[in-house]
Swiss-Prot record:
Gene3D superfamilies: translation initiation factor eif-2b, domain 1 (1.20.120.420), Translation initiation factor eif-2b, domain 2 (3.40.50.10470)
SUPFAM superfamilies per UniProt: NagB/RpiA/CoA transferase-like
Protein name listed in UniProt: Methylthioribose-1-phosphate isomerase
EC number(s) per entry: 5.3.1.23
Native source species: Hahella chejuensis (strain KCTC 2396)
Gene: mtnA
Amino acid sequence: MSQSSVSAIRWANNQLILLDQRKLPLQEAYVNCVTHVEVADAIRQMVVRGAPAIGIAAAYGVALAAAEFGSDRDRLHRALETLADSRPTAVNLFWALRRMRGLIDGASVADLFPLLVEEATRIHEEDLQANLTMGELGADLIAESGRGALLTHCNTGSLATGGYGTALGVIRSAYRRDLVTEVFADETRPWLQGARLTAWELCQDDIPVKLIADSAAAHVMKTCAVKWVIVGADRITAHGDVANKIGTYGLAVLARHHGVKFMVAAPSSTIDFELFSGADIPIEERTSDELKFVQGTPLAPEKADAFNPVFDVTPAELIDAIVTERGVVLRPNAEKMLKLQ
């Protein structure tokens, strides 16, 4: 099974090459990173986004730091801190940096660069394989409900991961098994990841997609025979609470009201077993300009303030299934989540 026709992260000629997701779908442009600071800036400015992709990019950023600083552990540790500060919510970032730090602290060789490139590449490849596994496990759940429409939020495909996708990987696998009549993609304000990225990915793979306004989700669930809402995750607690793109919580509430199943697909690296309550997940807030402007064009009065949290937390009791490469947890709770540790 191929990963998809989309690739957002490449390592070539000792550079990290990122598809600039801010410019999609109108332009396919790339950003070449040759320093760890450039990688951190790319993460912060959302050139690359999606929890797994952020972790992968950060791992390559550590390798670039070794190209800059050699075996100077102090400077490498500061580079790790710079990368860790780029986005606060996605736990995959910190998971990947812990792996890279363990290699830095444990290696005895003078030249760390090839070792760190190898580890970053391994993280990248492991994510792709995890996504392929999740795709099949999630499609098995969809098969139990029968063929029908799916609804997804934000972007969880190859653009957000090492390839194939988490929630979008499930959708890809289900479509290949003729389980999907159509996909409804929320536009996902304010960055419009659904409109710009998910719709673009699905069109690239010739999967039928209908873009909807975020506010149309309830009507679509009520009238369009949606079988599953399928989303990704930026952090999952030990009890099964899920932090994901703002609007996910509302979709879970709507799905429960309309009798629609709600699935979260994410690699096990997204689970933070040291965090027990979703209330303790740090929620990133971004500038009000992201709400008040689109590509430099004002949408709101200049004097109007804006509140722009970019994640919310869906409690475990609203989730029907969490799908990881290690297995599936139905109706998650603390005891069931332990099987994924």
